[in-house]
Amino acid sequence: MTLPTTQNGPLRHFLQFKDLTASEIGYVLDRARIIKDKFKRYEPHMPLHDRTLAMVFEKASTRTRVSFEAGMYQMGGSVINLTSNDSQLGRSEPIEDTARVVSRMVDIVMIRTFEQTRIERFAAHSRVPVINGLTNEYHPCQILADIFTYIEHRGSIAGRIVAWVGDANNMSYTWLQAAEMLGFTLHVSTPAGYQLDPARIGNPPPSVLKQFKDPMQACQGAHLVTTDVWTSMGYEAENEERRKAFADWCVDAEMMAAADPNAVFMHCLPAHRGEEVTGEVIDGPQSVVWDEAENRMHAQKALMEFLLLGEIH
C-alpha cells in the first residue's frame, strides 16, 4: 500500500467529463491506444503494481465491474469490491465516513451509484482519486470509451456530428459536456416530456447542441448515432409509459441511412433489441458496439494510470 497521494500534483477526481481538460482527455485517449496495443500484443503493462482499487457498487453492473476489475489486475494492481449488501453503506453509515476510512486503505476508488451528490460527497472527504462509474446524472467513463472507439474507427471527432436518439439521461448530458470541450456538435432527439433540462444545460450555441423533435432529422448527416435503454435503473415503474412514449425513437436502418454514409452506431449496453434499436442495426456492419464495450477497459486503464501517475513521457 502506497501513501494516498498521486504523482501528478494535486488530488484529481473524474466525477464529470469536464473534470479533465480537453488536452488531458486527449492524453488519456492517446494512452488508451498505447495500452490497448500492448494488450493485443500480450505485452505486460503493470505500472500500478502494489496499488489497490476499491469499487463501490450501489447500482448493479456487468461491464463496469468487469472492465475496472480486469483492467486493474492487468496493470498489476488489486481490487476490493464493495456493495451495499456487504458493507456499512447499506446500514446507514454516512458516505463521508466511508470515504474517510476507505481512502486511507486504498489508492483509488470507483463508485457506481444513484445521485451525483452522493459521489461528490464521497470525493470531498477522500484522500485518493475517485472515479464516477455511473450516476443518475453522468456517465463519463462510458463517453471516454465511446470517443476512443470513434477515433479508433473514424479518426478525430472534432467537427463531427453525434446524434443522440432517446431518453435525455446521464449519457446525453455527458455527451453534451464532451461536445463543449472537444469541438463536435451534438444532435439530440427525445419525446416530449423527456427532453434535456434547460436548467442543467444553460444555453449552448448551435455549434454545440441542436435539439430535434423528429429523430430522423437528428440523424441527418450524423457521423455517430447512439442511444440507450428507454428505462434506466430506478425508473422501472415507468416502463410501460416509456415504451409508448419512445415507440418512434427506435434506431433502425432508415435512421442510419439518413446519417453520413460512414456513420457508426454505438450503444452503452445492455441493449433491448426491438425497443431503442433494431437487431438489424446493432448487429449490422455499422455497429461498433462490441469494440465500444471492450474499450471501456482500455480507456479506464489509461484514466487510472493518469490519475495515479500523471502524464508519462
Swiss-Prot record:
Binding site for L-ornithine: N170, D228, S232, M233
Organism (species): Bordetella avium (strain 197N)
Function field: Reversibly catalyzes the transfer of the carbamoyl group from carbamoyl phosphate (CP) to the N(epsilon) atom of ornithine (ORN) to produce L-citrulline.
Entry EC no(s): 2.1.3.3
Family per similarity comment: Belongs to the aspartate/ornithine carbamoyltransferase superfamily. OTCase family.
One of the GO BP terms on file: arginine biosynthetic process via ornithine
Molecular-function annotations in GO: amino acid binding; ornithine carbamoyltransferase activity
Catalysed transformations (reactions): carbamoyl phosphate + L-ornithine = L-citrulline + phosphate + H(+)
Compartments reported by the entry: Cytoplasm
Class of enzymatic activity (EC top level): transferase
Protein keywords: Amino-acid biosynthesis, Arginine biosynthesis, Cytoplasm, Transferase
InterPro entries: Asp/Orn_carbamoyltranf_P-bd, Asp/Orn_carbamoylTrfase, Asp/Orn_carbamoylTrfase_sf, Asp_carbamoyltransf_Asp/Orn-bd, Orn/put_carbamltrans, OTCase_ArgI
Residues that coordinate or bind carbamoyl phosphate: S61, T62, R63, T64, Q88, R112, H139, P140, C141, Q142, C268, L269, R296
This protein's GO CC annotations: cytoplasm
Name listed for the protein in its UniProt record: Ornithine carbamoyltransferase
Gene3D superfamilies: Aspartate/ornithine carbamoyltransferase
Primary location recorded for the protein, binned into one broad class: cytoplasm
Known pathway: Amino-acid biosynthesis; L-arginine biosynthesis; L-arginine from L-ornithine and carbamoyl phosphate: step 1/3
Source species, domain of life: Bacteria
NCBIfam families xref list: orni_carb_tr (TIGR00658), PRK00779.1 (NF001986)
Signal is among the record's keywords: no
